[in-house]
A protein has these predicted regions:
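Long, non-catalytic architectural segments outside compact domain cores
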Residues: 11, 66-78
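Short, charge-rich amphipathic interface segments used for partner binding and complex assembly
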Residues: 34-70
Length: 78
């Protein structure tokens, strides 16, 4: 099995972030929808875990697009 390159991982994380932003926006548009809130939270949890693992490995969060406050960016409530 081959290992992912940093560029491939960056691409994958970027796609997940795009879906997460869409999920957060949908949750804002339909407040108090348990499904929409749960979907947004699931993306947040996944990206937060990835971010923490990258931090633990001293990776450049900016390169991977995770140098932001995920809580602020992905909150279903503004």
């Amino acid at each position: 099995m081959r290992k992912l390159t940093d560029d491939e991982l960056q691409f994958i994380i970027g796609r997940v972030m795009t879906y997460a932003l869409e999920a957060a926006e949908e949750a804002r548009e339909q407040p108090y929808s348990d499904f929409k809130d749960g979907r947004a939270l699931a993306f947040y949890e996944a990206l937060d875990t990835i971010r923490n693992e990258l931090l633990a490995r001293d990776c450049d969060l900016k390169f991977f697009g995770l140098d932001c406050s995920l809580e602020r960016v992905l909150s279903p409530r503004k």
